[in-house]
């Protein structure tokens, strides 16, 4: 009997390999997701169209045919489906982005399709960086500036739908002009301590009017903030070339001037409002691509980099054996998303570990984003790569187990 009792403590001290579950995970119940039709239970093809377990739909802010990038720049239009994304959670999983890709073949001026994929990468880079210190992310409509001058709607040279945000409008003259816009400190019950705001313009300056060359500049300005673009490079007539370019700005609540020198006025109509939490938690992003029949891009992978983001790349093409169509119901992603069904012990690029062997300290830096190769239940000395933070819960569990075995032995001895 003594050997049986000694078995349990010796087992506890044995180093056991940890095999991560590849895919996103969460350590606490305070998590949320952002998605598209592959996580949208309101889609008529659901649940066959889902890449996530159906019971997780309430955890995701999702809209079929939409994306967070697309929704920031456009309103609902025949070519675009906009959605007011809104979700809150200390830990965040992003699985969207494919609805704006080379398949859409979008270009506004001379930047081309590749130029817009670069803008998509810039947007998601800033979104993921800002989201690490925010619990809530909410796309909001901004109040239109008052006392707008006479404006004519801008157009794309390609006859595509010009982005609605920011608004790019043609002035009736070239007198330097400013209008005020406000980034609010709250939206409903959501506190906005920061905003993700697009700043877009046509580059290379010098827009021609009546054969004359006019410089061009735009800016967002307040007493404590300035961001602008100015270019007077002459490009006249048929040689004149312009790219639609966007930068994505971290801006605080307040009143700003949108100013212009030249032909166009640019001001924002939407922003992603975010609050601020007192810890930094890297976000997780899953590769969002089409099946091989359509062109995809790697913007999500390029945007999601350590230390602010953990990227989960597919290892096979988008492949469906039991979905609603060739682009909904990928076998590999469905398997990857199973890790979201339960709390995990640690999160890393290699996956999550659904073992209750780690303390809640794993959500804080520098623990979040790493998992040990082995665990030892009691021993916390030595190499940090093979030991994890033990907790009194597990110590108590093993002590109780030993006590129960001893008690059973005593009872058996008493009746014998």
UniProtKB/Swiss-Prot annotation:
<keyword id="KW-0348">Hemagglutinin</keyword>
<protein>
    <recommendedName>
        <fullName>Hemagglutinin-esterase</fullName>
        <ecNumber>3.1.1.53</ecNumber>
    </recommendedName>
</protein>
<dbReference type="GO" id="GO:0019064">
    <property type="term" value="P:fusion of virus membrane with host plasma membrane"/>
</dbReference>
<dbReference type="GO" id="GO:0020002">
    <property type="term" value="C:host cell plasma membrane"/>
</dbReference>
<feature type="glycosylation site" description="N-linked (GlcNAc...) asparagine; by host">
    <location>
        <position position="278"/>
    </location>
</feature>
<dbReference type="Pfam" id="PF02710">
    <property type="entry name" value="Hema_HEFG"/>
</dbReference>
<feature type="signal peptide">
    <location>
        <begin position="1"/>
        <end position="14"/>
    </location>
</feature>
<dbReference type="Pfam" id="PF03996">
    <property type="entry name" value="Hema_esterase"/>
</dbReference>
<feature type="glycosylation site" description="N-linked (GlcNAc...) asparagine; by host">
    <location>
        <position position="343"/>
    </location>
</feature>
<comment type="similarity">
    <text>Belongs to the influenza type C/coronaviruses hemagglutinin-esterase family.</text>
</comment>
<dbReference type="GO" id="GO:0106331">
    <property type="term" value="F:sialate 4-O-acetylesterase activity"/>
</dbReference>
<keyword id="KW-0732">Signal</keyword>
<dbReference type="GO" id="GO:0046789">
    <property type="term" value="F:host cell surface receptor binding"/>
</dbReference>
<dbReference type="InterPro" id="IPR007142">
    <property type="entry name" value="Hemagglutn-estrase_core"/>
</dbReference>
<keyword id="KW-0325">Glycoprotein</keyword>
<keyword id="KW-0378">Hydrolase</keyword>
<feature type="disulfide bond">
    <location>
        <begin position="304"/>
        <end position="309"/>
    </location>
</feature>
<feature type="glycosylation site" description="N-linked (GlcNAc...) asparagine; by host">
    <location>
        <position position="76"/>
    </location>
</feature>
<feature type="topological domain" description="Intravirion">
    <location>
        <begin position="415"/>
        <end position="416"/>
    </location>
</feature>
<feature type="region of interest" description="Esterase domain second part">
    <location>
        <begin position="264"/>
        <end position="379"/>
    </location>
</feature>
<keyword id="KW-1032">Host cell membrane</keyword>
<keyword id="KW-0812">Transmembrane</keyword>
<dbReference type="InterPro" id="IPR003860">
    <property type="entry name" value="Hemagglutn-estrase_hemagglutn"/>
</dbReference>
<feature type="active site" description="Charge relay system">
    <location>
        <position position="328"/>
    </location>
</feature>
<feature type="glycosylation site" description="N-linked (GlcNAc...) asparagine; by host">
    <location>
        <position position="257"/>
    </location>
</feature>
<keyword id="KW-0472">Membrane</keyword>
<feature type="active site" description="Nucleophile">
    <location>
        <position position="37"/>
    </location>
</feature>
<feature type="glycosylation site" description="N-linked (GlcNAc...) asparagine; by host">
    <location>
        <position position="313"/>
    </location>
</feature>
<feature type="region of interest" description="Esterase domain first part">
    <location>
        <begin position="4"/>
        <end position="121"/>
    </location>
</feature>
<feature type="disulfide bond">
    <location>
        <begin position="41"/>
        <end position="57"/>
    </location>
</feature>
<feature type="transmembrane region" description="Helical">
    <location>
        <begin position="394"/>
        <end position="414"/>
    </location>
</feature>
<dbReference type="GO" id="GO:0016020">
    <property type="term" value="C:membrane"/>
</dbReference>
<feature type="active site" description="Charge relay system">
    <location>
        <position position="325"/>
    </location>
</feature>
<feature type="disulfide bond">
    <location>
        <begin position="200"/>
        <end position="246"/>
    </location>
</feature>
<dbReference type="GO" id="GO:0019031">
    <property type="term" value="C:viral envelope"/>
</dbReference>
<dbReference type="InterPro" id="IPR008980">
    <property type="entry name" value="Capsid_hemagglutn"/>
</dbReference>
<comment type="function">
    <text>Structural protein that makes short spikes at the surface of the virus. Contains receptor binding and receptor-destroying activities. Mediates de-O-acetylation of N-acetyl-9-di-O-acetylneuraminic acid, which is probably the receptor determinant recognized by the virus on the surface of erythrocytes and susceptible cells. Also hydrolyzes 5-N-acetyl-4-O-acetylneuraminic acid and N-acetyl-9-O-acetylneuraminic acid, but displays a substrate preference for N-acetyl-9-di-O-acetylneuraminic acid.</text>
</comment>
<feature type="glycosylation site" description="N-linked (GlcNAc...) asparagine; by host">
    <location>
        <position position="322"/>
    </location>
</feature>
<dbReference type="GO" id="GO:0030246">
    <property type="term" value="F:carbohydrate binding"/>
</dbReference>
<keyword id="KW-0261">Viral envelope protein</keyword>
<feature type="topological domain" description="Virion surface">
    <location>
        <begin position="15"/>
        <end position="393"/>
    </location>
</feature>
<keyword id="KW-1015">Disulfide bond</keyword>
């Amino acid at each position: 009997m003594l050997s049986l009792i000694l078995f349990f403590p010796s087992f506890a001290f044995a180093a056991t390999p940890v095999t991560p579950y590849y895919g996103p995970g969460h350590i606490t119940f305070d998590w949320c997701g952002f998605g598209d039709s592959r996580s949208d239970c309101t889609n008529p093809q659901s649940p066959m169209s889902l890449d996530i377990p159906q019971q997780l739909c309430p955890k995701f802010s999702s809209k079929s045919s939409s994306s967070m990038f697309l929704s920031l720049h456009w309103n609902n239009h025949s070519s675009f489906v906009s959605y007011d994304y809104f979700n809150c959670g200390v830990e965040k999983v992003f699985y969207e982005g494919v609805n704006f890709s080379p398949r859409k073949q979008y270009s506004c001026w001379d930047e081309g399709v590749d130029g817009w994929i670069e803008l998509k990468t810039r947007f998601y880079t800033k979104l993921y960086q800002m989201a690490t210190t925010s619990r809530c992310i909410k796309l909001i409509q901004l109040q239109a500036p008052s006392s707008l001058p006479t404006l004519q709607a801008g157009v794309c040279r390609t006859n595509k739908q010009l982005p609605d945000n920011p608004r790019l409008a043609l002035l009736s003259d070239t007198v330097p002009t400013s209008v005020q816009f406000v980034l609010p400190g709250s939206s409903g019950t959501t506190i906005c301590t920061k905003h993700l705001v697009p700043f877009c313009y046509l580059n290379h300056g010098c827009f021609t009017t009546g054969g004359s060359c006019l410089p061009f500049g735009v800016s967002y300005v307040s007493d404590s903030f300035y961001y602008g673009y100015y270019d007077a490079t002459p490009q006249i007539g048929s040689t004149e070339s312009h790219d639609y370019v966007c930068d994505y700005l971290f801006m605080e609540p307040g009143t700003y001037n949108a100013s212009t020198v030249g032909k166009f006025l640019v001001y924002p109509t939407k922003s992603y409002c975010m609050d601020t939490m007192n810890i930094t938690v890297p976000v997780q992003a899953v590769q969002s691509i089409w099946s091989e029949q359509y062109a995809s891009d790697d913007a999500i992978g390029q945007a999601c980099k350590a230390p602010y983001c953990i990227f989960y790349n597919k290892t096979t093409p988008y492949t469906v054996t039991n979905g609603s169509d060739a682009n909904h119901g990928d076998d590999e992603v469905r398997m990857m998303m199973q890790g979201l069904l339960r709390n995990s012990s640690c999160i890393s690029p290699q996956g999550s570990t659904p073992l209750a062997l780690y303390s809640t300290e794993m959500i804080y830096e520098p623990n979040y984003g790493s998992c040990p190769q082995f665990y030892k239940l009691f021993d916390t000395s030595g190499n940090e790569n093979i030991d994890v933070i033990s907790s009194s819960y597990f110590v108590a569990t093993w002590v109780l187990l030993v006590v129960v075995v001893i008690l059973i032995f005593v009872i058996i001895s008493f009746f014998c």
